[in-house]
Design a protein with these regions (language model features):
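Surface-exposed loop/turn motifs in large extracellular/passenger domains
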Residues: 1-171
Length: 171
């Protein structure tokens, strides 16, 4: 599915969902593919479990292609697992188009995990033991990542709130 979202005249967008919230998609099921071009300025995304600017939750082998993204200012993301791009992903693929730069400012607040790119990312493929972050090198993010009210229990990071490699347990 190709999706082009253009918001003009400084429109503020608020996306609020039950479990999973994202501007493009709340939940991407297994083996789904989504290509997104985004032009917006002010954006609030909140969900109970997972929230991200593009997708709340990505299931196994889902693919998100970011083809275009203009500057996003005043971005506020909040959920248990909150991420600048995706709230929670497992064995998912995210591709950033050649020459795409993403400038994002705002805040990411997660009561369990909060990360500039991903709130929570899990690898469980036996043949993959690394995460190649170089594809995100064109991103300029000034996001304040915080744990909200439960600072003692939250994992907070500028890239990942939590990165789990459970490949050793895969059969």
């Amino acid at each position: 599915v190709d999706l082009d979202i253009t918001l003009r005249n400084d429109v503020k967008v608020e996306v609020s969902g039950g479990d999973n919230a994202g501007l493009a998609c709340g939940t991407m099921d297994e083996n789904t593919s989504l290509a997104v071009s985004l032009s917006s300025s002010s954006l609030d995304v909140s969900g109970k479990s997972n929230a991200g600017v593009f997708v709340g939750k990505m299931s196994a082998d889902a693919t998100l292609n970011i083809d275009k993204c203009d500057t996003l200012t005043s971005v506020n993301i909040s959920a248990n697992n909150a991420g600048g791009l995706v709230g929670s992903a497992e064995n998912a693929e995210i591709n950033v188009g050649e020459g795409v730069t993403l400038t994002m400012t705002g805040s990411v607040t997660g009561s369990v995990t909060a990360g500039g790119l991903f709130g929570s990312y899990t690898y469980s493929k036996a043949d993959e033991k690394t995460f190649d972050i170089s594809k995100f090198s064109g991103m300029k993010m000034a996001l304040a990542c915080s744990s909200g009210d439960t600072a003692d229990s939250a994992a907070v990071g500028s890239v990942f709130g939590v990165l789990i490699n459970s490949a050793d347990s895969v059969k």
